[in-house]
A protein has these predicted regions:
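Blade-edge beta-strand/turn elements of extracellular beta-propeller
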Residues: 21-30, 69-81, 122-137, 173-195, ...
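Hydrophobic core segments of beta-strands in well-ordered, beta-rich domains
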Residues: 29, 35-55, 74, 89-109, ...
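Beta-propeller blade signature
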Residues: 63-64, 117-123, 170-175, 227-234, ...
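Loop/turn-rich, solvent-exposed surfaces of beta-rich toroidal or solenoidal domains
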Residues: 194-240, 255
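Extracellular carbohydrate-recognition regions
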Residues: 308-341
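Extracellular glycan-recognition surfaces and repeat-rich motifs
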Residues: 338-362
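Secretory/extracellular carbohydrate-interaction modules
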Residues: 366-421
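Residue-level detector of conserved catalytic or cofactor/ligand-binding positions
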Residues: 429-442
Length: 443
């Protein structure tokens, strides 16, 4: 068996094992960097997609029947839509007239401005047909969310994030097919506090329209992301911000948390899926999906069942289910195609793969100025890990394993011809080598 364990440094994940009891589970529910997650239920099956940033394929897709145990099945796009360039962020599911829509953020080839595109398929795991940009607004339009009200579709998004003015959550009616704007945009909510505002979930319940949105800093070691809420009796507002905001924020075991969407169980319970950073070494696992139950209080505001401080330990959504432990990843390359867990950093190298007779052939053409080769990557399941691979060393090309952040931040170990090579490139100083590195060569 030939195994390849390759990882990317910025998107690791934590192995949590079994939940403490059968009636509880431990967040994250997906191990690895899947930021800005969107969740939808179709019949008895739940589907997640999320940000893929500069990694291909684009927007990973996961499925589950119990909200806790997830399996990656593929991606929304195997190839980039023609109009897009980079920054594949915040996809949002929506089901309409028997079709599944995904509204996603990407930068345009023409001017590098982030806008919102739309694609349609028969199911979340089907082949999506892209219909191009649906929202182009100023310097940036990101973080789409769809609401149907009185038979009409409305799209909301974050605007003015790159302007010298308060961020606003804007909205506009869509055409009946959900593919184009129909009318003029209007403002839902404004960030007068200048603390940040994005990642909204917009819904109607018990006579109110609610916007659950994220505030403060989304990303990085100083992230203090949190979740707030506003409500209105009218779709177009004005929206009243909850005096007790934020309703969900970090804790001793969660650095920061936010940007999510709500799904409902068949019996009507509401679960909010968002992303969170973990403190300490877990931070480098990236923004991982967290699941928390939310209920409407007697005050007609939504509240999280386990309180405003984010908690990794949560009650199981379904008593008959139990959280399955995370197993080590291995691949013997006996399938006809690559497993969906694999990805590559597309801005730096065009990756080509061939699987034949239990072997993977990996090659690629680096972009101008890039000094590294092709890297096929996956998210590990712990901040501490062992990597092992068997390679066929038949030429002078470099081959081996890598800890990979991007082409400017990596550690590699492998061989070329009769040479055993260990090298690293560190631009961001995020990798610290505190102990001597040991190499073992098995002939």
């Amino acid at each position: 068996m030939r195994k390849i364990f390759t990882l990317f440094f910025c998107a690791a994940s934590l192995a949590t094992g079994l939940a403490q009891q059968e009636s509880y589970f431990t967040n994250p529910v997906i191990h690895g960097d899947v930021a800005d997650p969107s969740i939808i239920r179709i019949d008895q099956t739940y589907y997640i997609t999320g940000t893929s940033s500069e990694w291909a394929p684009y927007y990973p897709v996961f499925t589950s029947t119990d909200l806790v145990n997830w399996q990656q099945t593929g991606h929304v796009f195997d190839e980039k839509p023609e109009w897009t360039k980079s920054s594949f962020w915040a996809p949002e599911w929506y089901q309409h007239k028997g079709k599944v829509y995904v509204y996603y953020t990407a930068r345009k080839q023409s001017d590098n401005i982030s806008c919102i595109g739309v694609a349609v398929a028969d199911s979340p795991t089907g082949k999506f047909k892209d219909y191009g940009p649906v929202v182009e607004f100023g310097k940036e339009a990101i973080d789409a969310f769809i609401l149907e009200d009185k038979g009409k579709l409305y799209i909301s998004w974050k605007a003015y994030g790159l302007d010298n003015q308060p961020i606003e959550l804007l909205a506009c009616k869509l055409t009946d097919d959900g593919l184009r704007l129909d009318g003029k945009p209007f403002s839902l909510l404004r960030d007068d506090e200048r603390q940040g505002m994005e990642g909204q979930h917009w819904f109607k319940k018990d006579g109110y329209y609610y916007i659950i949105y994220s505030v403060r800093g989304c990303c990085g070691p100083q992230s203090d992301y949190a979740v707030s809420v506003a409500r209105s009796k009218k779709l177009e507002g004005p929206y009243e911000k909850y005096q007790g905001n934020p309703i969900l924020h970090g804790s001793k075991e969660v650095l920061s948390i936010g940007h999510g969407t709500i799904t409902t169980t068949p019996d009507g319970r509401m679960y909010y899926l968002c992303h969170a950073y973990q403190p300490g070494s877990g931070f480098y696992q990236g923004r991982q999906p967290y699941l928390q139950e939310v209920r409407m209080g007697e005050d007609h505001w939504p509240h999280f069942v386990t309180g405003e401080y984010a908690s990794r330990t949560q009650p199981m959504p379904f008593a008959e289910s139990a959280q399955v432990p995370v197993f080590d990843f291995s691949d013997d390359f006996t399938g006809a195609t690559l497993r969906p867990e694999w990805s590559w950093n597309y801005p730096y190298t065009d990756v080509k793969t061939e699987i034949k007779n239990g072997k993977l052939s990996l090659s690629g053409t680096p972009k101008p100025g890039v000094k590294t080769g092709a890297a096929l990557c996956l998210r590990p399941t712990s901040p501490d890990y062992t990597l092992e691979t068997a390679i066929v060393n038949r030429n002078d090309s470099w081959k081996g394993i890598t800890m990979y952040g991007d082409a400017n931040n990596l550690i590699t170990c492998g061989c070329a011809g009769d040479r055993l090579i260990l090298k690293y490139i560190l631009e961001l100083s995020l990798i610290h080598i505190s102990e001597p590195t040991r190499l073992r060569c098995i002939s």
